[in-house]
């Protein structure tokens, strides 16, 4: 399939939030629900799960390089990452749905991405004991990144100004529901399902090489130190931001004049957005929402 297939992606207007299975969603991720729900996972599938804007593309690219970087290097220059790692629940008019792309992947293992909260992940992934790589990012930076993403992506609801968006974020009125429930849901699942690797965006920024090693160890991959180093260099933020195959510049519904898909990739950028009052309110809400969990985040390095 050619890259140009995505240029026929059609959107008439920004979607409205809808309530779906108890969380906020948009129809682009629910219109194909029967097929998503009944998706047939395989034992060697690798599901990359994150809340939006938490490092999905980064981990997708690392995994793609680990598995296919050597055996089919042409993938890296001819196919954008969203074709190599299909977005399972996506169904936009004019392009193949995520389930169809995943079903037709020629590779093994199949790398598949989702933003679904844990309770909505197709049950065949658990039944087949597929491996799941979850990436979590601290709530403050995640909120900032999501705000800029919503501004530039016409496939997302209108975000309003920063303060409006932040209030919605704290209330969990974002596409894919509350951040708090998302990160906690997968953290809890990890206690009963051993095939989840729970990663933190902040750890990846701090030491990408170390986290690539953790991935290899979880996936049972034996890669040489030289190979891991080559991959670590290739997935640095600035390299990916310039790379047409990873920066989403080939998707017409994203307006890069407003904000690039890959903006800063830093830890602590929230300090440039939160006022003192917003920060105090956010901390208060955070304490309430996260009081029954052991998962801990770093908001700066």
UniProtKB/Swiss-Prot annotation:
UniProt keyword Cytoplasm, yes or no: yes
Which InterPro entries does its entry note? P-loop_NTPase, Sulfotransferase_dom
| Amino acids binding 3'-phosphoadenylyl sulfate | 53-58, 137, 145, 201, 235-240, 263-265
What temperature behavior is annotated for this protein?
A: Active from 20 to 43 degrees Celsius.
Q: What is its main location?
A: cytoplasm
* GO MF annotation terms: aryl sulfotransferase activity; sulfotransferase activity
Q: What influences the activity of this protein, per its activity regulation comment?
A: Inhibited by Hg(2+), Co(2+), Zn(2+), Cd(2+), Cu(2+) and Pb(2+) ions. Activated slightly by Mn(2+), Ca(2+) and Mg(2+) ions.
Q: Which UniProt keywords apply?
A: Catecholamine metabolism, Cytoplasm, Lipid metabolism, Steroid metabolism, Transferase
* Family note: Belongs to the sulfotransferase 1 family.
UniProt name for this protein: Cytosolic sulfotransferase 3
Taxonomic source organism: Danio rerio (Zebrafish)
What gene does the UniProt entry assign to this protein? sult1st3
């Amino acid at each position: 399939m050619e890259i140009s297939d995505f240029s026929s992606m059609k959107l008439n207007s920004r979607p409205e939030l809808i309530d779906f299975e108890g969380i906020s969603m948009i129809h682009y991720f629910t219109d194909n629900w029967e097929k998503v729900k009944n998706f047939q996972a395989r034992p060697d599938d690798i599901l990359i799960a994150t809340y939006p804007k938490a490092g999905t593309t980064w981990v997708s690219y690392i995994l793609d390089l680990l598995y296919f970087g050597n055996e089919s290097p042409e993938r890296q220059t001819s196919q954008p990452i969203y074709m190599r790692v299909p977005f399972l629940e996506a169904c936009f008019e004019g392009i193949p749905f995520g389930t169809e792309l995943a079903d037709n992947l020629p590779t093994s293992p199949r790398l598949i991405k989702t933003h679904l909260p844990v309770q909505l992940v197709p049950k065949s992934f658990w039944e087949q004991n597929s491996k799941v790589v979850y990436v979590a990012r601290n709530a403050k930076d995640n909120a900032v990144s999501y705000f800029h993403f919503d501004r530039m992506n016409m496939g997302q609801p209108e975000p309003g100004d920063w303060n409006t968006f932040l209030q919605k974020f704290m209330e969990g009125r974002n596409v894919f529901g509350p951040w708090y429930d998302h990160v906690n849901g997968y953290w809890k699942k990890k206690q009963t399902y051993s095939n989840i690797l729970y990663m933190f965006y902040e750890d990846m920024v701090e030491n990408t090489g170390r986290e690539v090693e953790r991935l290899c160890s979880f996936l049972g991959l034996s890669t040489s130190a030289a190979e891991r180093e080559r991959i670590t260099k290739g997935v640095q933020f600035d390299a990916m931001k310039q790379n047409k195959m990873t920066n989403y510049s080939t998707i017409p519904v994203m307006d890069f004049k407003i904000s690039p898909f890959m903006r800063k990739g830093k830890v602590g950028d929230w300090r440039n957005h939160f006022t003192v009052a917003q920060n105090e309110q956010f901390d208060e809400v955070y304490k309430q929402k996260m009081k029954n969990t052991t998962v801990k985040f770093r908001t700066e390095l």
